[in-house]
Amino acid sequence: MEDDLVLVLSALEKEATKPPWKLSFPHVLVATIVSFLFGYHLGVVNEPLESISTDLGFVGNSMAEGLVVSICLAGAFVGSLISGRIADEFGRCRALQLSALPMLLGASICATSKSLVGMLLGRLLVGTGLGVGPPVASLYVTEISPAHLRGTYGSMIQIGSGLGLMGALLIGFPVKTIFGWWRICFWISTIPAAILALSMVFCVESPYWLYKQGRNIEAEAELEKLLGSTHAKAAMAELSKLEKGGEITSVKLVELLYGRHSRVVFLGSTLFALQQLSGINAVFYFSSSVFRRAGVSSNLASVFVGIANLIGCAVALLLMDKIGRKVLLICSFFSMGMSMALQVLAANLSVSSPNVFYLYLTGMLLFVLMFAIGAGPVPALLLTEIFPNRIRAKAMAFCMSVHWVLNFMVGLMFLQLLDQVGPQWVYSMFCACCFLAVVVVKQNVMETKGKSLQEIEIALLPRD
């Protein structure tokens, strides 16, 4: 009995001595603006695309309409390639500020464009900012978060994206009757971009980046702001176990692919690849037409999908630091596979069957819900945890480039595959990728819940 009491008191004492969340939360909240902009810009052209094509003179040109939507992905790919270098050269805070600039400029060009060329240029610039911002935001949030809150704060990135997608849809309702209303949608996006650029001036720099630069005194000062003076010394002692700034050399691509940490880089790329090959973006793309066939308006369809996404994000926020990243990933991918199996079943039923649309809708909403619980937020958080401090920014940039390439390929080939092999086989391929992801995660992913970044890095050091 006394032993149990000692254990309870010890647990309570440990809980009471954890760094307060109020110190780090404001900085995380500012970084989350990047993910809001990410969601907003990916969804902002979906609803007003017809009005844009009419006003700019390319109505009926499906190639031009497709470019307006997808050129953002090309810009994001380019941005992701340089995001690691920018984050390492200028620091996380300055990198986030720099990512806001092309989003500000690009959105302004889109809002004032008089031709297709102007719209494409603006979307390309916005995409470049989106390629730089999200990976740096994930780095920043991971590096400034206390260990016991890192999962919770990491989930806020996905919530920001969900809110951005919902905002892109809902913002059109009150202004849709105004001539050229789509221009207002682009102008509105400049507000959070400006807030991001200005607010980062008051945010702390990543202590990990400062230490990597050999600026130890500044790193300790930032740790005090994030954790409080009580915990800063211990955190600095942990930080000193990593490679010192003077030992840091430039990280080359060949080192990421063939160096001592190539295994974790390969794992990170695989997780992002499986995330895209699960079919999530194809589901988002095709959801409106499926809902319309069921007699539901496309606007309402987007709201349903958006709500399912936000509910999943909220669940992830609550569970990430309780049951861990690995469990969430396994449950998420497995449930996504089962949800996709429902859509395979629906695709095999007769279109006239009264239950076919219910199966489609149930499978689709469950798929989005379970994606948002694990497969959506966990990879970006997990990778910033398992990558060593020395290669973290460059490795994250490489993995994000894989993400954007596959995002583009799935979007490009989805409708063609539907026509050539039918929905049964397409959904079956997505289903198989989800179950393959379960096996990959179960065999290769380390649980990082509650561990400091230093503990994770030491645990993953290759045995030479």
What is each PLM-predicted segment?
Residues 232-244:
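Short, well-structured alpha-helical segments
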Residues 229-234, 459-463:
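Short arginine-rich
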Residues 1-224, 245-464:
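Alpha-helical transmembrane bundle of multi-pass membrane proteins
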